[in-house]
From Swiss-Prot:
The keyword DNA-binding applies. Signal peptide: none annotated. One of its GO terms (molecular function) is DNA binding. Gene3D superfamilies: Ribonuclease H-like superfamily/Ribonuclease H. This is Transposable element Tcb2 transposase. Belongs to the transposase 5 family. One of its GO terms (biological process) is DNA transposition. It is found in: Nucleus.
Length: 273
């Protein structure tokens, strides 16, 4: 019975104690109590934890991630000095997106077996777009409508490009992920027309993008701060974004070799970053 309890949990870490209790029940044995199930799992080192949410990555993209990480493993802060990292992010007005639990051994939070795979989605919150370089932060841009290629072009033309040219210089290199609207013919033509160089970027690689650390920084500072409407929430986000010190930027750019090495060590699977 004890071995079955542990086996069922290892086969599906998202099973609750109640589910496991029902699965291991047999006609010829006494049904274990929930307390017994939980105790056996804890004895086996399987404690209830919140899973790390990471994207599911295809084999092709894992190979590409490792190749990119190896190519940039020894880049230092100066190598990234003329690069502009970008991304958009969603912040809830209040509440959460829901909490799921899994059982896993200590120290295995980022093991793919114990991660909760996610897909991008929108709705019901404040969406923002931002970018930064090694010398400056751009003005945070609020996204009020559906983020299509035309909205993205407006952001590039009227927010990103003027800021990048004035703070980084004309020879900046722009980073973006491979979202379809970013790679559409319409946007590719904009980059060609405006003579903007792009950083080759592996798909499904938010953990390689240092701007993710900035989104986490903003989230930590606004979490628990109530906003009565979307305008107030955006004001909160903007205040935190503008207050990020350049020492934080230096730190996350210095983390790039570690990010690359971690991706290599993980064979392209999602990492802790």
């Amino acid at each position: 019975m004890d071995r079955n309890i542990v086996r069922v949990s290892r086969e599906d870490p998202q099973r609750s104690s109640t589910d496991i209790q029902m699965v291991v029940k047999t006609p010829n044995e006494v049904t274990p109590s929930l307390r017994t199930v939980r105790r056996r799992l804890q004895d086996a080192g399987l404690h209830g934890r919140r899973p790390a949410k990471k994207p599911s990555i295809s084999k092709k993209n894992r190979i590409a991630r490792v190749a990119w990480a190896r190519a940039h493993l020894h880049w230092g802060r100066q190598d990234w000095a003329n690069h502009v990292f970008s991304d958009e992010s969603k912040f809830n007005l209040f509440g959460t997106d829901g909490i799921k639990w899994i059982r896993r051994p200590v120290g295995c939070r980022f093991d793919p077996s114990y991660q909760l795979q996610t897909v991008k989605h929108g709705g019901g919150s404040v969406m923002v777009w931002g970018c930064f370089s090694g010398t400056s932060m751009d003005p945070l841009r609020r996204i009020d409508s559906i983020m299509d290629r035309f909205v993205y072009e407006d952001i590039l033309e009227n927010t990103m490009r003027p800021w990048a040219r004035s703070t980084v210089g004309r020879a900046f290199v722009f980073q973006q992920d491979n979202d379809p609207k970013h790679t559409s013919k319409h946007i590719k033509e904009w980059f060609r027309r405006r003579h903007v160089d792009l950083l080759d970027w592996p798909s499904q690689s938010p953990d390689l993008n240092p701007i993710e650390h900035l989104w986490e920084h903003v989230e930590r500072h606004v979490r628990g701060v109530r906003a009565s409407n979307a305008n107030q929430k955006f004001d909160q986000l903007q205040d935190v974004w503008q207050a990020i010190p350049m020492s934080v930027i230096d730190t996350i750019l210095d983390s790039m070799p570690r990010r690359c090495q971690t991706v290599i060590d993980a064979k392209g699977f999602p990492t802790k970053y």
